[in-house]
């Protein structure tokens, strides 16, 4: 057989002394090999990971619930006897109304409750309820056997009224509102100063204004300022559109207004914003047909809640309208609406600021002369300037460019301000304000 490798490249065992003895690795060598390829903090990271695993294991043991398809605990952790006893002890309660408290100052007071469409009962309190928690006229939960009062219930409020409360704050701040510097200062004096520094009014012995009317042509920033107020304040903010209070059935709109202020009084501090208040706040008149009687009843209830027999509490009211000349004089008087803030057309500085605000979020070239653009848009509202910026972006998209140039803005001014002038209602609304 031919030797292809070659005798000089093949290792042959000539002497047993040439082979070195193989020594087994001890624990020190193994520990040294394990350190190869590790960083400085590998040991600390490993220790933290072990601690996390131990904590997760302990949490799962304490909760006794693991992720499963049914979402139930393992059968070994079920306590059917205790669950059955709980179901027997906690029975569903019936809703009733406490109409009168007998011997309220004594050690054993009695409570007269009225179960709707059933009967009236004189009952006691259960052991879980304190006598100070129950008041006359309050809704309570009673059991079905002895009709004892178990829990006090909150007042009944229409879900449509509850949904008017703004849970998530808008993303509009005062810096996003341009051309309304003076109006924002007046608004903050009414809304923020009484909430943040009430001692200033106490020292002077005056009550802060509780109502503000925002009026002006469409597109001047009335609703935008209200959104900025909602973002700024920590008080509960309720937004109501005037047309929502115009209901089909008699008395429904007035009931919604009552429940709206009833919910607002339960809050520590509350702001109610009525947008397009002229939908229900128009001057009263008799057209002979009686079609507007229900709207007038809703407005009368609103007038009574603003400054009637019952105190309003720490409730601030903002109202916005385009037609202040159509509002009822009783709604406009001081005490109900203490301050009237006019949102007029922005001046040159305001228009320049509005251009910069909208261009801030756009991809535009540098050194655009916003003051020149503002001079080319006389008697324009903030909404029209925003439309100019949008159209400038559309011109850039049409030309397949990634940034908008000054030429795009000039063409947008010619399109929006010049061409759409016949659609503008600003001059007509200026005569109303």
UniProtKB/Swiss-Prot annotation:
The keyword Zinc does not apply. Monoubiquitinated by RNF181. The keyword Cell inner membrane does not apply. Gene3D superfamilies: 1.10.8.60, Nucleic acid-binding proteins, P-loop containing nucleotide triphosphate hydrolases. GO terms for cellular component: cytoplasm; cytoplasmic ribonucleoprotein granule; cytosol; extracellular region; ficolin-1-rich granule lumen; membrane; nucleoplasm; nucleus. One of its GO terms (molecular function) is ATP hydrolysis activity. It is found in: Cytoplasm. One of its GO terms (biological process) is positive regulation of proteasomal protein catabolic process. Residues 8-22 have a biased composition (Basic and acidic residues). Induction: Expression is not cell cycle-dependent and occurs throughout the cell cycle. ATP binds at residues 216-223. Its main location: cytoplasm. Residues 1-22 are annotated as: Disordered. Pfam families: AAA (PF00004), AAA_lid_3 (PF17862), PRS7_OB (PF21236). Component of the 26S proteasome, a multiprotein complex involved in the ATP-dependent degradation of ubiquitinated proteins. This complex plays a key role in the maintenance of protein homeostasis by removing misfolded or damaged proteins, which could impair cellular functions, and by removing proteins whose functions are no longer required. Therefore, the proteasome participates in numerous cellular processes, including cell cycle progression, apoptosis, or DNA damage repair. Belongs to the AAA ATPase family. Component of the 19S proteasome regulatory particle complex. The 26S proteasome consists of a 20S core particle (CP) and two 19S regulatory subunits (RP). The regulatory particle is made of a lid composed of 9 subunits, a base containing 6 ATPases including PSMC2 and few additional components. Interacts with NDC80/HEC; this interaction is detected only during M phase. Interacts and SQSTM1. Interacts with PAAF1. Directly interacts with TRIM5. PANTHER family: 26S PROTEASOME REGULATORY SUBUNIT. This is 26S proteasome regulatory subunit 7.
């Amino acid at each position: 057989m031919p030797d292809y490798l070659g005798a000089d490249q093949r290792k042959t065992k000539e002497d047993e002394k040439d082979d070195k003895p193989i020594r087994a690795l001890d624990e020190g060598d193994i520990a040294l090999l394990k350190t190869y390829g590790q960083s400085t903090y590998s040991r600390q990271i490993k220790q933290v990971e072990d601690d996390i695993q131990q904590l997760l294991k302990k949490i799962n043991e304490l909760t006794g619930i693991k992720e499963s398809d049914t979402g139930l605990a393992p059968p070994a952790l079920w306590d059917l006897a205790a669950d059955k006893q709980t179901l027997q002890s906690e029975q569903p309660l019936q809703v009733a109304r406490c109409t009168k408290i007998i011997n309220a100052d004594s050690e054993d007071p009695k409570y007269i409750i009225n179960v709707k469409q059933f009967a009236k009962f004189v009952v006691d309190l259960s052991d879980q309820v304190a006598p100070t928690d129950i008041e006359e006229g309050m809704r309570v939960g009673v059991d079905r056997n002895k009709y004892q009062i178990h829990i006090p219930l909150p007042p009944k409020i229409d879900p449509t009224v509850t949904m008017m409360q703004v849970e998530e704050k808008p993303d509009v701040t005062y810096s996003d509102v341009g051309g309304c510097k003076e109006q924002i200062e007046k608004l903050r004096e009414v809304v923020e100063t009484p909430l943040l520094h009430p001692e200033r009014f106490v020292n002077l012995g005056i009550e802060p204004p509780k109502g503000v009317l925002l009026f002006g042509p469409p597109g001047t920033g009335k609703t935008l300022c209200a959104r900025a107020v909602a973002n700024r304040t920590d008080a509960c903010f309720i937004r109501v559109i005037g047309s929502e209070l115009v209901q089909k059935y008699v008395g429904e709109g007035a009931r919604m207004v009552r429940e709206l202020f009833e919910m607002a009084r339960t809050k520590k501090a509350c702001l109610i914003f009525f947008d397009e208040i002229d939908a229900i706040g128009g001057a009263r008149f008799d057209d002979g047909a009686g079609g507007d009687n229900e709207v007038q009843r809703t407005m009368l209830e609103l007038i009574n809640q603003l400054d009637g027999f019952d105190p309003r509490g720490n409730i601030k009211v903002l109202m916005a309208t385009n037609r202040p000349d159509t509002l009822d004089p009783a709604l406009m008087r001081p005490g109900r609406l203490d301050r009237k803030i006019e949102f007029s057309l922005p001046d040159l500085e305001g228009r320049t600021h509005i251009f910069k605000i909208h261009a801030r979020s756009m991809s535009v070239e540098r050194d655009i002369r916003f003051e020149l653009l503002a001079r080319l848009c006389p008697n324009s509202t903030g909404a029209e300037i925003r439309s100019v910026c949008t159209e400038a972006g559309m011109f850039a998209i049409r030309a397949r460019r990634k940034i908008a140039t000054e030429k795009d803005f000039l063409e947008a001014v010619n399109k929006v301000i010049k061409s759409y002038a016949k659609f503008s209602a600003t001059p007509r609304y200026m005569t109303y304000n």
